[in-house]
Amino acid sequence: SKNLKAIAVRGKRQIHVADRQLMSEISKEFSAIVMENPLTRGLYENGTAAAVLGNSAAGILPTKNFHYGEFDRAESISAEAMNEKILVAREGCYACPVRCKRAVKSERYSVEPRFGGPEYETLASFGSLCLIDDIEVIAKANQMCNEYTLDTISTGMTIAFAMECFEANILTKEDTDGIELVFGNKEALLATIEKIAKREGFGNVLAEGSKRASEIIGRGSERFVLTVKGQELPMHDPRGKYSVGLAYALSEKGADHMVAAHDTMIASKDQFSFKEIMPLGILEPEKPTKFSPLKVRTFAYLSMWWSFFNAAGICDFVPVPRSSMSIDDVINALNAFTGWKTSVFEVMKVGERALALARIFNAREGFDAKDDIVPERLHGPLKNGALKGSFLPKEDFMQALQLYYGMMGWTENGIPTKEKLLELGLEWLVEG
């Protein structure tokens, strides 16, 4: 009723640091190794956009609403294209040496650097997913979403859903306010974003997101919806990275690519990222396209590690395996900052506790194992690229979910047991 979308709070007091000298030493050490490590160096040079060409070559770049894994014009929306045509600055969060943020400018589409620049997810969701090959159009779409406070993944996925409906004659120009909503139509993309933001005409339907929009449209459109728990898929195809399928299904808030490390980060003993994550008890790599007890155990450990990041407010692009800050340095930094004497064991339990608490919250709202699924399209084959014919095997996937539940101390229905809650110090949930 108040039309309130958000409350922004900006603190003015300085944050207390328990051991400022030690914290400064750790920060200097990390800053020094950032440019020596290829993972963080790559983030500085090309940002997350570096994933565009690699994922397309690997056959896992979502293309045409996840029908394909390779985009034949990926070069046009790549980091290299951005660097050459529209990049004006490399920026970052306060005091961060990685500086993975892009600032771009385009005279043709009035794109301003103050809105930053498109990340990988945006390049894919407005690019390959919708068959758009114009980096400046994608930058404009990104700016519009930032200005209107729209999520670029869900917006791109919802528009791709509508484009597939249009292609299948479920939607016509009469439905879309005269917009020729076909894959590859650049102006249609921008016009639709505007309509979604202002809830004008057909935009009022798409503003609900693809799942609810499909319920309004009907006519078989539900088969083009790619969501988990109502949230659209990010731009990583689980048919080439099986753990990502588990991440999508298990995330308490719906499909999320930032729940745990992706399979390709730890697929070989020779990888820096694999070597550095071994102290967590991950001693053997596993093929990205394979389900096994080893794969599930690795995912369980890494989901706890990632969950701890969220609890502590640590950027996923700083610690291993995604970047170069070692496990010891993460723990030492946390202790220096807080004055605690914590350990790897304790922070892993913090992550596990947060995961269990989220499951209990969702269970209260009616979510359980029936909701830990991925769209049927992912259980079908990719239609092109290096992984043509690959699919996420449904039976193996469901067995992996059950194994994960067991490893986490959850029931077959995905609910933490009384014993697990007590072990995690969440007895108040049992008593309640």
Residue map of PLM features:
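Extended C-terminal regions of large enzymes
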Residues: 1-432
